[in-house]
Amino acid sequence: MSGPDEPFHNLEKVLDELIERGYNTIRICAAPILLYGDLGVAANALAISSMGGAVGEGTRWYNPRGGITIDLQSRLFELLALAKKKSVWVILSSWEYQQSPAFSETSDWNDALMDIPPGMRFEVLAQCWVRMLEEIKARGLRDVIAYVELHNEVDLSLVGVNGRWTDSDHWDRKTSMEDAIGLLRSAHPDLLHTTSYGIPPFLHMDTAPSNSQVAHHHLYVYGVLQALFDWSQIRAEPPVYPTAEMKSLLRPDAPDFDTYRAGVKAWTLDATITPLSYLYASDYANGAAWDAWLYRNYALHELEMRRGIDYRLSAISTWSKLHGVPAVIGEGWVGFTPAASEFEDGPIGQEITQYAVQSARELDFWGIVVGSNRAPHHSGWSDISHQLSINEEFIHGGTRE
């Protein structure tokens, strides 16, 4: 989304806007393996593309226009230098085994990543981070780093496995993650190092790496949104999908699923690990129909969602205090809604946000997000007053009603 007229084309403008909204930190995929892993992929002339056809156009995260070429390393250091100029912190992360390569014109980046054996990926990541951090320091940019996150959502990515992460993987991958974090801590002891979970192991928090220096987790409560997913069978496969219920949530111009599927570049689905059925539902979502369903059914799930927020924040807070490290919610609160849906940006979504942020503050969390629908490429970015009030409340406090 860095092309002309796209949201991230002018990085200085983006940073000015986030400061205006009360933010002081950004979190990015710094692509450490691509830039410092000797993959043989030309990162200095990385061609950016859409996922093919209309795929991703109705989502909040998979809709770059493409058609541009980026010198990724130059772009990274431009951003870090601007962050230093603006006094903005940067959380360095990697989405390389989850989404980032899907927006490349070719599969070269993704293929090179997948050629690394799963059992070696955490170690390779750590080695690449070590080299990247050395260069960041050499350029005088060390002080903009809030902390280093080994990889985004290890449990919802391909960083440790080829396929879905199972319950046993929480234990099986713990040592590999601890070794990787240990390598980083040894090489760069002046920085904080951690990893992140998409669905934190709330019942088994001991499976999280014990040497993490930040308890970084994501908290999507879903609740009523999960009920919509279940009702519509959003993850079903043809011929069951799309169900009549799902069709009732689509625009009249939605093509049949087979026609839609023919437009996608198949390898990009492997790179995103996102079901095509979800992308289809988002790309052709009737936003009003989605929102009407969510509002009609919210009362059935309100208590469950609030309790879910309380329980999960408490589990994360307890772990962080036992280990003497700060706690951060790096993504959240409701879940992945189509771009056409305004539920999370509306009064109920804002109420959920306020409840979660107040709860996190009462538990002494170090950092939170206003919501994962608040970024320059989201419609909610235009609501300056809401973001500013939430950020000021987290920093300065408030009393729960």
Annotate each PLM feature.
Residues 90, 327, 367:
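Hydrophobic anchor at the start of a short beta-strand
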Residues 27, 330-335, 372-373:
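Short, loop-centered acidic/histidine patches that primarily coordinate divalent metals
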Residues 1-209, 243, 374-376, 390-391, ...:
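Active-site mouth of glycoside hydrolases
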Residues 49-52, 339-401:
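Aromatic-rich peripheral "rim/lid" segments of glycoside hydrolase catalytic domains that contact
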Residues 28, 217, 370:
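Short beta-strand and adjacent tight-turn residues that come in two discontinuous sequence segments
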Residues 40, 47, 105, 234-236, ...:
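A generic membrane alpha-helix/interface feature
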Residues 130, 134, 140, 147, ...:
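Extracellular glycoside hydrolase catalytic/binding regions
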